[in-house]
């Protein structure tokens, strides 16, 4: 197997295996295989640390280190650096929770009922919730008028959300980026929209405790919808800029947490109507083979595909394509950014055409329309 490039370094098969072993240990509290770490050098450990940063799972990987025998752990110098970064992740998670609860309280005090997508809504499912590296706050209002009302209340506080080309709205709350999404998911296939709306009515959002030291409640998608939304989210990033281990870990943790709460037949039928069955075989194969998710935790029983194609994509470009040279290049011109997005999708279209051809086609069509509109503008 070929080595994968990480910045200017090479992530070897040994380092990839070590990182996945540590992730599995943190997720399922299982002892890592000692033989994987017996020949690790200081340089190998540096590679694992760098890769865990780029995949935004460094705190979880550090947690996995605590289950290693002391004689197999990295040097004290590296361990101290890693623990310091873990502490920073925990601090940022606390800050995120404070900002989220403050925003939810503000919106609910004004009679609004936002739904928390991804983020802290998934972090609460983790064995160690504060170790999930947070990004921004994603909200959705099932009633469109409530989003408009939210913007009015925000404007009264001097906050003016910026409209994005994809229809979402972006602003900052207590220093944390917030995004209001017009839809539960960005599924591009127009013929699947009726199915999504039907599922949203059939499996309404639920009120759950946020946890993590607070008694607060938040609204999140139902278990059924949550897994479907994550499936689509991962697909879009896999055929676009890139997908990282954090999103895959989110999915694995969700599958394990929701075991017994999802009707297998209904989930498979919904996946079929959304044309996701072939993609699910690849995605579920990765979860079982690379993250050691017990197969009985999958939403339904199926014949799995090998997850190697997806794993290759993950190692190459990392979380949201942050390792990609295309993503790292800067430009002040929006059309150049659109060209890089189009080129990224074109270069990874083989994965999409093979496992989700309809969604890949309509995503490419939507991107092309967006570029034409920007040129006319």
Question: Which residue stretches match the model-derived regions?
Answer:
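Conserved NTP-donor binding/palm subdomain of two-metal-ion nucleotidyltransferases/polymerases, i.e.
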Residues: 2-135, 141-377
């Amino acid at each position: 197997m070929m080595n994968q490039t990480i910045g200017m370094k090479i992530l070897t098969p040994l380092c990839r295996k070590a990182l996945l072993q540590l992730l599995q240990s943190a997720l399922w509290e299982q002892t890592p295989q000692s033989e994987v770490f017996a020949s690790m050098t200081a340089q190998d450990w540096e590679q694992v640390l760098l890769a865990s940063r780029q995949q935004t799972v460094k705190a979880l990987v550090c947690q996995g280190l605590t289950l290693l025998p002391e004689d197999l752990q990295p040097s004290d110098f590296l361990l101290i650096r890693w623990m310091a970064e873990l502490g920073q992740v925990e601090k940022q998670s606390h800050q995120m929770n404070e900002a989220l609860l403050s925003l939810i309280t503000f919106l609910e005090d004004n009679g609004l009922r936002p739904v928390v997508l991804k983020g802290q809504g998934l972090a609460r499912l983790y064995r160690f919730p504060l170790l999930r590296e947070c990004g921004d706050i994603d909200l959705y209002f099932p009633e469109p008028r409530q989003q408009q009302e939210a913007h009015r209340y925000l404007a009264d506080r001097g906050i003016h959300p910026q409209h994005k080309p994809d229809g979402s709205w972006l602003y900052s709350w207590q220093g944390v980026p917030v995004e209001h999404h017009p839809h539960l998911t960005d599924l591009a296939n127009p013929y699947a929209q009726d199915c999504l709306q039907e599922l949203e009515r059939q499996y309404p959002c639920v009120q759950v405790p946020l946890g993590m030291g607070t008694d607060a409640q938040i609204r999140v998608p139902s278990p059924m919808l949550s897994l479907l939304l994550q499936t689509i989210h991962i697909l879009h990033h896999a055929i676009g800029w890139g997908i990282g281990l954090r999103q895959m870990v989110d999915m694995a943790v969700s599958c394990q947490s929701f075991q017994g709460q999802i009707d297998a037949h209904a989930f498979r039928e919904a996946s079929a109507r959304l044309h996701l069955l072939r993609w699910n075989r690849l995605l579920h194969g990765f979860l079982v083979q690379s993250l050691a998710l017990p197969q009985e935790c999958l939403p339904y029983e199926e014949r799995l595909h090998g997850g190697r194609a997806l794993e290759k994509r993950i190692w190459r470009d990392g979380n949201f394509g942050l390792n990609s040279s295309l993503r790292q290049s800067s430009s002040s011109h929006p059309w150049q950014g659109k060209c890089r997005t189009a080129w990224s999708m074109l270069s990874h279209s083989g994965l999409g055409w093979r496992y989700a051809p309809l969604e890949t086609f309509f995503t490419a069509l939507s991107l092309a329309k967006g570029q034409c509109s920007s040129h006319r503008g």
